[in-house]
C-alpha cells in the first residue's frame, strides 16, 4: 500500500518545493499536484527537483487547451529528469 500526499493549489512554487521535501521526509510515497492556479507540469517539476525519491503525479491535467505533442514531450522530459518518478 502506498500513501500519497496532496497540496494546496494556491502554494507558490517555492512552497511546493518545501512541501515536497517535507512529504518525502515524513515517508510519503508520492505527491499529487493540481493543475489549477499554476501549470501542473511546472508544479510537478518543482516538486521533483526538490526531492530524491518522492514520486509525483498530476491529480488532473487539463489537456484541452494544450497541444497533445507538448504534453507528451513535457511528460517524457519530467520522467527522464526525475529518473522515473513522474
Language-model segments: residues:
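Glycine-rich "substrate-gating" loop/helix at the edge of Rossmann-like oxidoreductase active sites
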Residues: 34, 61-67
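Flexible, glycine-rich active-site loops centered on histidine and acidic residues
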Residues: 2-10, 15, 65-86
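N-terminal beta1-alpha1-beta2 module of alpha/beta enzyme domains
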Residues: 1-58
Amino acid at each position: 500500500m502506498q500513501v500519497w500526499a496532496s497540496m494546496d493549489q494556491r502554494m507558490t512554487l517555492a512552497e511546493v518545493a518545501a512541501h515536497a521535501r517535507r512529504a518525502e521526509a515524513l515517508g510519503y510515497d508520492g505527491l499529487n499536484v493540481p493543475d489549477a492556479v499554476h501549470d501542473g507540469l511546472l508544479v510537478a517539476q518543482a516538486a521533483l527537483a526538490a526531492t530524491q525519491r518522492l514520486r509525483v503525479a498530476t491529480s488532473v491535467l487539463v489537456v484541452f487547451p494544450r497541444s497533445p505533442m507538448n504534453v507528451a514531450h513535457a511528460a517524457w522530459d519530467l520522467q527522464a529528469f526525475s529518473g522515473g518518478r513522474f
